[in-house]
Amino acid sequence: MSIGEVSDSAGHLASLVLPIEVAPIAPLIPEPPATAEHIFTLRHVYHHGTHKHPSLHRKHDVTPSNADVWLAAEDGYEAERIGPLRARSNALRIQRLVDRRPSVVDPMVAQSRQQGFVSVLSPSAWTVDDVAGPDVTDKGTVLTMALMAANAYVEGPGKADWQDVGAPFNRSLDFGWEGDGLRGHVFADENNSTIVIGLKGTSPAVFDGDGTTTNDKVNDNLFFSCCCAQQGPWTWHQVCDCATGTYTCNNTCVTQALREENRYYQAARELYANVTEVYPDSHVWIAGHSLGGAVSSFLGLTYGVPVVTFQAVPDALPAGRLGLPVPPGADPNAPQSRDYTGAFHFGHTADPIYMGSCNGATASCSFAGYALESACHTGHECVYDTVGDKGWRVGIGTHKIVAVIRDVILKYDTVPECKFTPECRDCGNWKMYESNGTETTTTSSAPTTTSISRTRTETCKTPHLKSQQQRQRPRPRPLHALPQWEGGNPDSPERNEEM
């Protein structure tokens, strides 16, 4: 065979060889975070003004000598110091913005507030992450988060050395600043890998005295009423004038009132920005009770961080009015239908505030001037059935955080299953419409209250058990005597009673 024939034969064989297919390289998918144990200590206390002093922002750094965590006294329970705060983290899936820095997100929220609707972002701006979040199936972790929320109500320790954050505060306005605003206690674990922010909630004057009460009532009725606390019982404290007819509401008007810069949500965002500037590489969890729980949820939806609340007022209604960023395909007006938010709302069935039923003409909340008409929570609801399990009657007295810790969380052997409730709807009787903001609104009154699609009991009565004054009970076992806690019970610090 000649060289030419060999060459032709080799070329023919080469043409018969099939090309080698190269398998596509799969994208690297990070492993979900493993379960871990954390021990938290109190590191800082932040205070941000809202109404009287909206530019005030102060910080107190806690030293090891005064880093004690206190559970406030309440209804026969003495204030006491709590031992180590232990919590377990586990993988938690959250859909959130890729770039979640406050310097990036806050202008988006401001733009939505100015234009009256949520800006549409590209799908590439969103991601679904498995983050290290609190293990809400673990009783000890839920208890620790509740104690952090409760600690946010304790004023002290003593005369704290407060430092201004940002521009110096006018010292001539110093008097009374501590009673106005939003306060957050910041806890961190041993290596600062995770921090928890506990936010201060509501302290209604009709139940517990003054403090931030009056401001909280304004915010509560802006947040949680269908339309400015209008067209309800005469006792409701009206906060704006957006009703244009019988059960007809200018939602643009409500949205504008809700987004004023001196409101709690804006103060909470600034507080969050300053805390995360101190801990830029840490995982952030947020805990709160009552109004503090709802505001915590707003922060979680804004920045994509895990949130655990206790007896939070249903938050979906105001969340849909705040201009929060929403992923593609989500309904901005129904945030309760959005999954993977990282929010878990713990509560029990005897609390009319948590259940969204404290709004009838004879309800305690209505007598106090509160128009709490919202019924839907974002994220997941984790409900203890104290009515069915313990025979409790619905009553406002069951809302307090210390009672929830003592009589609910500690008494149950396990935590409830957390359920997603996207079918819930708020303000079913109302017709909401958007406008260009130039209409003149009028006020009209009606003796009835707004109904909702979710069935709730509207009876606000005292608990089935005898009142604290009537029943004799043994002295409660102090928390530091329980297996999870260590420490003593020295003289209690100055404190602020809460609802």
Curated annotation (Swiss-Prot):
Cytoplasmic topological domain: 1-9
Catalytic activity field: a triacylglycerol + H2O = a diacylglycerol + a fatty acid + H(+)
CDD domains: Lipase_3
Lumenal side: 31-499
Topology within the bilayer: Single-pass type II membrane protein
Keywords, ordered alphabetically: Autophagy, Endosome, Glycoprotein, Hydrolase, Lipid degradation, Lipid metabolism, Membrane, Signal-anchor, Transmembrane, Transmembrane helix
Keyword field contains Glycoprotein: yes
First-tier enzyme category under EC: hydrolase
Record's compositionally biased regions (Low complexity): 438-454
Catalytic center residues: S290 (charge relay system)
SUPFAM superfamilies: alpha/beta-Hydrolases
TM annotation in the entry: 10-30
Gene3D superfamilies the UniProt entry points to: alpha/beta hydrolase
Keyword presence, Plastid: no
Spans annotated as Disordered: 436-499
Residues carrying sugar: N170, N191, N192, N250, N274, N436
Major localization class: membrane
EC number: 3.1.1.3
Any one GO biological process: piecemeal microautophagy of the nucleus
Subunit comment: Binds to both phosphatidylinositol (PI) and phosphatidylinositol 3,5-bisphosphate (PIP2).
Known role: Lipase which is essential for lysis of subvacuolar cytoplasm to vacuole targeted bodies and intravacuolar autophagic bodies. Involved in the lysis of intravacuolar multivesicular body (MVB) vesicles. The intravacuolar membrane disintegration by atg15 is critical to life span extension.
Protein's name according to its UniProt entry: Putative lipase atg15
